[in-house]
Amino acid sequence: MMVIPVSFKFKTMDDIEVTGKTVLVRVDINSPVDPNDGTILDDTRMRLHAETIRELSDRGARTVVMAHQSRPGKNDFTTLEQHARALSGILRRPVKYVEDIFGSAARENISGLGDGEIILLENVRFYSEEVLKRDPEEQAETHLVRKLAPLLDYFINDAFAAAHRSQPSLVGFALRVPSAAGRVMERELRTLQGALENVERPCVYVLGGVKVDDSIMVMKNVLENGSADLVLTTGLVANIFLAGCGVKIGKVNMDFIKSRGYCDFIKVAKKLKKRFPERIVVPVDVAVCRDGKRVDVPVKKIPNHPIQDIGMETIKLYARRIREARTLFANGPAGVFENPDFSIGTEDILNAISSSEGFSIIGGGHLAAAAVKMGFEDSINHISSGGGASISLLAGEELPAVRVLEESRHP
């Protein structure tokens, strides 16, 4: 499937002249970090955003990089000093770390930038207002935006993975400074919107993992608007639908659903399955952990043991439906893929997706990590860098960071 070009209502980097201009670029380089010494364990996101940063530098922009790492209270909530070093290595040019966000040191470093030079400001979430969720208009009035905006010629948002959040660094600058989308943001929106607007049939969604609220939100939207022909359920999502269908899934599995606060979704699942009986597919068997080993059982005979994967018969059924699809969206693993005994469902579904002739998209998060780990990265059309943002898009929700790019005024 060829994705038909999407026309954007916002500017991209192709539309602006950045030579000699001061450009603030918001990226999402939030990375796994060793809590003991702050060492970055995976630089995937930095390599992704390096494309945008390198292009700005090559075009002679005075580049100010803004990013976050984790959130307050987490053990990986660190400075961005290591990130600056890692970016310098990836870009093969200096990236100066500035231990300030919008104070005098930050402003002096911004004002002193030369053409092509790059600085990385401190973790923007060290600033308390950054973690408040408010309307973009309010975020444009924060100290962060009011202090830095006068020093900037352009704001570029490349943080697609955080585009569903309405925080000052993501939505505030676009209302005060001429703005554009970075290359990651542009590519993600072009692919996802293009696939959503030009669906080839049949269109199959594979929804699993443990974020049940996200999956049900997406499912409801794509079934009601008719864009999905079939939804295959896996993971905890499948367990909740099985319970909604009256299947006795065992006390240990019901207790897990309760522990996640998902009991109310059993009723929601029951109603959805009743409305779309042929279009929502649930497993016919599951794999449980019994005495530390994988045991496949029919759903009518689930013992009181943790469900860890979909069963082999379900895998065969799902793989056939996936291979028939012309458009595929998948989110969330089928089971506890970190355990080799229970990685079969996730791996076989990814294998079916990668060998399908349909256009395939994976919505970030754990399934994306599994796809890379299992070697399917190059055979899937698009692996999104933004789990939450891609889910919001598939659920028909507005992305605040994209809306303000559309509203940004240019001279």
UniProtKB/Swiss-Prot annotation:
Superkingdom classification of source: Archaea
Residues the record lists as binding ATP: 338, 364-367
Any one GO biological process: glycolytic process
Any one Pfam family match given in the protein's UniProt record, by short name: PGK
SUPFAM superfamilies per UniProt: Phosphoglycerate kinase
GO CC term, one of those recorded: cytosol
Protein residues bound to substrate: 28-30, 45, 68-71, 125, 165
Catalytic activities: (2R)-3-phosphoglycerate + ATP = (2R)-3-phospho-glyceroyl phosphate + ADP
Protein's UniProt keywords contain ATP-binding: yes
Places the protein is found: Cytoplasm
Transmembrane segments: none
Nucleotide-binding found in the keyword field: yes
Major subcellular location class: cytoplasm
Molecular functions (GO terms): ADP binding; ATP binding; phosphoglycerate kinase activity
UniProt EC number: 2.7.2.3
Pathway note: Carbohydrate degradation; glycolysis; pyruvate from D-glyceraldehyde 3-phosphate: step 2/5
Protein keywords: ATP-binding, Cytoplasm, Glycolysis, Kinase, Nucleotide-binding, Transferase
Quaternary structure annotation from Swiss-Prot or TrEMBL: Homodimer.
Family the UniProt entry places it in: Belongs to the phosphoglycerate kinase family.
Protein name (Swiss-Prot/TrEMBL): Phosphoglycerate kinase
